[in-house]
Curated annotation (Swiss-Prot):
Highest taxon of the lineage: Bacteria
Gene name per UniProt: menD
Chemical reaction(s) catalysed: isochorismate + 2-oxoglutarate + H(+) = 5-enolpyruvoyl-6-hydroxy-2-succinyl-cyclohex-3-ene-1-carboxylate + CO2
InterPro entries linked: MenaQ_synth_MenD, MenD_middle, THDP-binding, Thiamin_PyroP_enz_TPP-bd_dom, TPP_enzyme_TPP-bd
Protein name as catalogued: 2-succinyl-5-enolpyruvyl-6-hydroxy-3-cyclohexene-1-carboxylate synthase
Matching NCBIfam families: menD (TIGR00173)
Cofactor dependency: Mg(2+); Mn(2+); thiamine diphosphate
Keywords from the named record: Magnesium, Manganese, Menaquinone biosynthesis, Metal-binding, Thiamine pyrophosphate, Transferase
Family: Belongs to the TPP enzyme family. MenD subfamily.
Documented EC number(s): 2.2.1.9
Organism: Salmonella typhi
Pfam families in the cross-refs: TPP_enzyme_C (PF02775), TPP_enzyme_M_2 (PF16582), TPP_enzyme_N (PF02776)
Single Gene Ontology MF annotation: 2-succinyl-5-enolpyruvyl-6-hydroxy-3-cyclohexene-1-carboxylic-acid synthase activity
């Protein structure tokens, strides 16, 4: 019997089973122990293959692919710390709902906890963060192939959102020519190999029931809060809220067009809060809210009912309101709960939103970080998409910009870390093949710098704007100790990104005014390549501008 040959047949069943559940993208890192899985993926024509030398970046690449494709994405890594590097992407997927299938090669049981090289306790190492964990046995013909395929089918059928960790131990030898070992074992699956359906088909009902008293609540004074959702859902939510006559507070990731822009500014005005207190019901569609003032209002509002609708399970309401948690796709829920045409009941909030917008527009000419956030709408590629980083940049765009309704916007706003942002953006571009604008801070870019390797070959223009404010200026908005702020919070690195771009053979610009930025963008959108644009801005101007605008709007 050839161990290596049977390992490959075992792996081939696993990979083929994945195709029956919509897996098309497979992300592969180099490794020896993962050879059976890698070869099985490479030989399966159903897959689009992606490779990267860094497992942490690979996990985030898969995350970006899953965000756009809305299908599960598989990741193959070798044993040891390679597996641990998937943790950040796994955690993010668990919070934002993308489906990741993590295929982690492992040493066989007899090599664990005995000093063997590259052998760690992988089974269950991700604790409660995966939606499901499956620890497979060592490949053996004593276990029928139908057990293996039905086990994979069951796990995937139960995967509503988040990650599935499949730990796959393989004994040596890992290399060798294929022979007939295990062929009969494999052939017992019969015509399943020529079919396109899962071996085991399970149905799981997730659709939310219609709220029978909706006809009553839609006649009340309501507020719509829009969190993370798809572009199509964003347009539908905007129309739904407009028909109801309810004010819509749209997050930067809502893609609703934010009809009441600058919400994070005007929510700091007591007049707005007083008017919102008249709401009898708040309907929140989508989770992962960004704005600080929005979260503060959400935490203190006390409507008669607070409904949260999202396709992800769990409470998703850090303020723990009395109300209803409805698990459903937003578009499906809207169809079940149609709006009734009513006059808008809010008068003060539209006025404050317009005045806040005017205050922001008045400062747009200064070349700075806050002004870039406001102007970002003007720089979006036609028929393209936007990827927004974390920390200060996403807060500035949320507070100061008004993105077009239905324009695709992506971000990692689950755990909201700055790790893996460039890798995620690369996945977003690969899955869509659209022109992509990504905007991150300098520390975020440094954190994931080797992801520039993923951006060397793109299928459409990709522009990476690095806002270099020399450190983590988000901490300038927080009451961090002044004497300790620079060394222990901001951590300025005093670097530029021209050499990084050159190392990966990427185009590079460092504009010093809006005209130079617009010229660089115009050239970048004509070229199917990656362009790094570094905006060197005053360290604290972005945070200070936001604070000044908050103070101005609060006194309107």
């Amino acid at each position: 019997m050839s161990v290596s040959a049977f390992n490959r047949r075992w792996a081939a069943v696993i990979l083929e089973a994945l195709t029956r559940h919509g897996v098309r993208h497979v992300c592969i890192a180099p490794g020896s122990r993962s050879t059976p899985l890698t070869l099985a993926a490479a030989e399966n024509p159903a897959f689009i293959h992606h490779t990267h030398f860094d497992e942490r970046g690979l996990g985030h690449l898969a995350l970006g692919l899953a965000k756009v494709s809305q299908q599960p994405v598989a990741v193959i890594v070798t044993s040891g710390t390679a597996v641990a590097n998937l943790y950040p992407a796994l955690i993010e997927a668990g919070l934002t709902g993308e489906k990741l299938i993590l295929l982690t090669a492992d040493r066989p049981p007899e090599l664990i906890d005995c000093g063997a090289n590259q052998a760690i306790r992988q089974a269950g190492m991700f604790a409660s963060h995966p939606s499901q964990t499956l620890s497979l046995p060592r490949p053996t013909q004593d276990i029928p192939a139908r057990w293996l395929v039905s086990t994979i089918d069951n796990a995937l059928a139960m995967l509503h959102a988040g990650a599935l960790h499949i730990n796959c131990p393989f004994a040596e030898p890992l290399y060798g020519d294929m022979n007939d070992t295990g062929l009969v074992w494999q052939q017992r699956l019969g015509d399943w190999w020529q079919d396109e359906k899962p071996w085991l088909r399970e149905a799981r009902r997730l659709a939310s029931d219609k709220q029978r008293d909706w006809f009553f609540w839609r006649q009340k004074r309501g507020v719509v809060v829009a969190g993370r959702m798809s572009a199509e859902e964003g347009k539908k939510v905007a129309q739904w809220a407009q028909t109801l006559g309810w004010p819509l507070i749209g997050d930067v990731l809502s893609q609703t067009g934010q009809p009441l822009p600058c919400a994070d500014l005007w929510l700091g005005n007591a007049k707005a809060v007083t008017e919102l207190q008249q709401a009898q019901i708040v309907v929140q569609l989508g989770s992962s809210l960004t704005g600080k003032r929005l979260l503060q209002w959400q935490a203190t509002c006390v409507p008669e009912e607070y409904w949260v609708i999202d396709n992800i399970e769990g409470r998703l309401d850090p303020a723990h309101h009395r109300g209803r948690r409805l698990v459903a796709k937003i578009a499906d829920w809207l169809e079940l709960h149609p709006a009734e045409k009513r006059k808008p009941w809010c008068v003060e909030i539209p006025r404050l939103a317009e005045l806040a917008w005017q205050r922001v527009v008045a400062q747009r000419d200064t070349f700075g970080e806050a002004q870039l956030a406001h102007r970002i709408r003007d720089y979006l590629p036609e028929q393209g998409q936007l990827f927004v980083g974390n920390s200060l940049v996403v807060r500035l765009i949320d507070a100061l910009s008004q993105l077009p309704a239905g324009y695709p916007v992506y971000s990692n706003r689950g755990a909201s870390g700055i790790d893996g942002l460039l890798s995620t953006a690369a996945g977003v571009q690969r899955a869509s093949a659209k022109s992509t604008l990504a905007i991150v801070g300098d520390l975020s870019a440094l954190y994931d710098l080797n992801a520039l390797a993923l951006l060397r070959q793109v299928s459409a223009p990709f522009v990476l704007i690095v806002v270099n404010n020399n450190g983590g200026q988000i901490f300038s908005l927080l009451p961090t100790p002044q004497s300790k702020r620079e060394r222990f919070y901001l951590m300025p690195q005093n670097v530029h990104f021209d050499h990084a771009a050159a190392m990966f053979n990427l185009r590079y610009h460092r504009p010093e005014n809006w005209e130079e930025l617009e010229s660089a963008l115009a050239g970048a959108w004509r070229t199917p390549a990656t362009t790094v644009i570094e905006l060197v801005v005053n360290d604290t101007d972005g945070a200070q501008t936001l604070q000044q605008l908050l103070a101005q709007v609060s006194h309107l």
